[in-house]
Amino acid sequence: MRPLHPIDLIFLSLEKRQQPMHVGGLFLFQIPDNAPATFIQELVRDIRTSKSIPIPPFNNYLNGLFWDEDQQFDLDHHFRHIALPKPGRIRELLTYISQEHSALIDRAKPLWTCHIIEGIEGNRFAMYFKIHHAMVDGIAGMRLVEKSLSHDPHGKSIVPPWCVEGPRAKRLKAPKVSRIKGVLSTLKGQLESTPRVIYELSQTVLKDMGRNPD
């Protein structure tokens, strides 16, 4: 298990229906001209049947004040494949993204979802990735997604974004004793820094309220 960082705890505490605390990225792709009609179906199948194993933070869920490994990880809950209604314009795409992005992520599961969206005009498809800010910040999350992509349009090797090893996953591969020491050390540091973090955050909020009185 890994303790929640105080700032992550604040993000979770402040979240409400009208104020979601997740971030999202939308990637738009062109289907190759010579691709078969089953291109998207094959892509989705390859992702779902990938032998790569989900790694932290993508296989972690909230367990009290800790992140814990989800022993019953269900890929179908997180990875979704949909087709836009015709005519499949950017308008329909953004309507779908707006609806999905407004929904809070289920806290009983790892806090992310990924959508492959086909049926976009111009022979295109999209990937929409949503992840909670408490799990990973937006920039780091998008970097992990980009690592799973290839510059080679003919590349067949697929590593799903949730299987890409980032710095956090490497830290968690340390021996168990080292990880326990790391958790205790991290928890001690976080408890010591909590008052300062809360003070700095409150000052930022007050400044924003001063700039935006409404």
What are the functions of these language-model segments?
Residues 1, 10-17, 67:
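Membrane-targeting and insertion segments and their boundary/processing signals
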Residues 17-19, 104-105:
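A general structural signal for short secondary-structure junctions and capping/turn motifs
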